[in-house]
Design a protein with these regions (language model features):
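Transmembrane helical cores of multi-pass secondary ion antiporters/exchangers
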Residues: 1-423
Length: 423
């Protein structure tokens, strides 16, 4: 099966599942697509058990074996989804909430990594699961970032007020880049290989240099190429060519970031903010803005559907759920507690500077959905019994956050006086 065949099947399945959700379930698109895909996966497993020799499970395993989820998301879908999200974020609102967003995306991520890692290690030890503290901290790094893809789709549907939208979208856009950097550093220390591509455990100084190069380099590269793209857009008024320029900017910038060893997600977010704000105001005609918004909204919707379809099918990546279900379920409340701590501390520190919205901590805690980035990172680790426990735990947290938190966050927002129709 070639790449086109795989893509054709995925897009067709995403369209069918999206139709089923829109026609019958009427859930938010991300939650609905994931639910339909998950139920379909469970039906395949059930048929395979009830009808011996059906080979449906092996056929599904074979199809998923054609897809490298880590490569598909981290080196494919992610750059387009991040740029599409950043393109519609108000930079002025982001700057106004800058200190809070910075605290959530840095201190918050580090706190979450620590709480998840330590509590997971203790819990696994109590139930006889042999996983080291460093590996549990690595798990904390891959599960801590909130998913900007899921969160921003949610914000559009809920019509959240601008200040809250800037806080949630800003954190989720940046903490995935920080989380990936922390994950790679901890994976190197744990000598897990995979995404980190290591041969020996690095020193603290090497890790510091690595983190600074990834983050600062990503910001600088994103600003530099974002400015080049802005100047190119400003010099002409031809919307097909301008669409091509934005597409080329995203793809070349993301590829270049890997060649020069800086954070691709951070670089793409910075470029998206630049083009979506300064570029939108000063370099685009009304007609161009309309076409670019429509184009990137379509990209966002289509790739989101494919991503959450893949998430629903990745249940087959766990070889034996019976062996790992208990630890996976225990990790869910641990991650919720870690999210609460990682939000409460930066918010408490920011209250010294002035009053913040009532209920901000529970709102940010419950809206911190996890998604494809976490699954891609855990799948990048080498296969082992320990990796299967981490994979099942990651999947449990992602499914809980998208289906339970994603479908109930509207109630949380309404409880604190925000949501559709609020200002």
């Amino acid at each position: 099966m070639n790449a086109f065949d795989v893509a054709a099947i995925l897009v067709a399945a995403a369209a069918v599942f999206g139709y089923v959700n829109h026609r019958f379930l009427r859930l938010p698109s991300t939650s609905g697509t994931l639910l339909v895909a998950l139920v379909s996966s469970l039906v395949v497993v059930l048929i395979d058990r009830v009808i011996p020799g059906s080979d449906l499970r092996s056929a599904m395993d074979g199809f998923l074996g054609e897809i490298d989820f880590d490569q598909t998301l981290m080196h494919g879908l992610l750059c387009f989804l991040l740029f599409a999200g950043a393109l519609h974020v108000d930079l002025d609102g982001l700057i106004q909430q800058g200190w809070l967003i910075a605290g959530l995306a840095t201190v918050g991520v580090l706190l979450s990594v620590t709480v998840v890692g330590v509590l997971t290690w203790v819990t696994f030890g109590l139930i006889g699961v042999d996983v080291s503290l460093l590996v549990c901290l690595t798990f904390g790094a891959l599960i801590s970032p909130t998913d900007p893809i899921a969160v921003m789709g949610l914000l559009k549907e809920l019509k959240a007020p601008p200040t809250l939208e800037a806080q949630i979208a800003g954190e989720s856009l940046f903490n995935d880049g920080v989380g990936v950097v922390v994950f790679m550093g901890l994976a190197s220390l744990a000598q897990l290989g995979g995404a980190a591509e290591i041969t020996a455990a690095p020193s603290a100084a090497e890790l510091t240099v690595f983190a600074l190069r990834e983050v600062v380099g990503g910001i600088v590269l994103g600003m530099a190429l974002g400015y080049v793209g802005y100047r190119a857009l400003k010099s002409l008024d031809d919307h097909p060519l301008e669409l091509l320029i934005t597409l080329a900017l995203v793809m070349f910038l993301y590829a270049l970031s890997f060649w020069v060893h800086v954070s691709g997600p951070i670089a793409v977010v910075i470029a998206g903010l630049f083009i979506g704000n300064r570029g939108r105001r000063l370099a685009m005609s009304d007609r161009t803005r309309e076409h670019i918004d429509a184009f990137w909204s379509m990209i966002d919707e289509v790739l989101n559907a494919v991503l959450f379809l893949l998430l629903g099918l990745e249940v087959f990546a766990v070889a034996r759920w019976a062996d790992v279900l208990a630890p996976a379920l225990l990790v869910v409340p641990i991650c919720l507690l870690a999210r609460l701590v990682s939000v409460a501390v930066p918010v408490a520190a920011m209250r010294v500077r002035g009053p913040l919205r009532r209920g901000l901590v529970p709102i940010l805690t419950w809206s911190g959905l996890r998604g494809g980035i976490s699954v891609a990172l855990v799948l990048s680790l080498p296969r082992s019994p320990g990796q299967q426990v981490l994979l099942a735990s990651t999947y449990a947290v992602v499914v809980f956050s998208v289906l339970v938190q994603g479908l109930t966050v509207r109630r949380v927002l309404m409880h604190y006086g925000v949501g559709e129709g609020s200002h």
